[in-house]
A protein has these predicted regions:
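PLD/PLD-like phosphodiesterase catalytic module centered on the HKD motif
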Residues: 1-172
Length: 172
C-alpha cells in the first residue's frame, strides 16, 4: 500500500473514469473544513453550505460525463450528532448527482467489511481512509491488490443492498 497526500487524493477523486463508491463506517468524523459548520448547526445557526459548492461542481462534472458516484453510510441509531448534521447537509450533493444511502448498523452485522472506510475507484484502485479515535483523518493509502479490490467491491455491494436511499431514510 502507498500513502498519498491530500492533494493526490483530491486528484484521484477528480480523475476516475467510470465509477466511484465510498463506504463510511464511523459514527463521527471531523475535518478542519467540517467542524466549524457542524458547530454552527449545533448552535442552531444558518449555514448557506457555500463551502460544499466545489465538491458539488465536481460531482456535476462526473454525472455530466456519465460517471456514477455512490456513497453508503453505515450508521448507529439513534444517529450521532455528526450523522444528524451530515443528514441535514446531504441534499446539495444529492442534487449534484451523488447517490447517498443510509444503512442502520444492525442491518450489516453479518457482512464482512474492511477495517477502514474506503473509496473504490473504477473497480481498480482502493483508497483506504485512516482516522484517529476522534474522527480526524490521519492517512490515506492506496491499493491495487486484487484481494483488496475484491474485498471492497463485495463489501460495498452487500452493504448497498441493505441501504436506504436518502429521500426514504427516516433518521432515528
Amino acid at each position: 500500500m502507498t500513502s498519498i497526500s491530500d492533494d493526490e487524493f483530491d486528484q484521484l477523486l477528480t480523475d476516475f473514469e467510470r465509477t466511484a463508491v465510498h463506504l463510511e463506517t464511523r459514527d463521527a468524523y471531523g475535518t478542519t473544513v467540517e467542524l466549524p459548520h457542524m458547530a454552527q448547526w449545533a448552535a442552531g445557526e444558518h449555514d448557506d453550505l457555500e463551502w460544499l459548492q466545489g465538491w458539488c461542481a465536481t460531482l456535476r462534472n462526473h454525472i455530466d460525463a456519465g460517471r456514477t458516484v455512490r456513497r453508503a453510510r453505515i450508521v448507529s441509531e439513534p444517529l450521532s450528532n455528526y450523522q444528524q448534521w451530515s443528514y441535514s447537509i446531504a441534499q446539495p450533493m444529492i442534487d449534484a448527482g451523488e447517490d447517498i444511502r443510509w444503512v442502520p448498523r444492525r442491518r450489516v452485522s453479518s457482512i464482512a467489511i474492511p477495517g477502514n472506510d474506503f473509496y473504490l475507484l473504477d473497480n481498480a484502485l482502493v483508497v483506504f481512509l485512516h482516522y484517529s479515535g476522534d474522527g480526524l483523518g490521519v492517512a490515506k493509502v492506496t491499493s491495487t491488490d486484487p484481494h483488496d479490490i475484491q474485498l471492497c467491491r463485495t463489501a460495498f455491494e452487500a452493504v448497498w443492498q441493505q441501504a436506504i436511499p436518502h429521500r426514504e431514510y427516516q433518521p432515528v
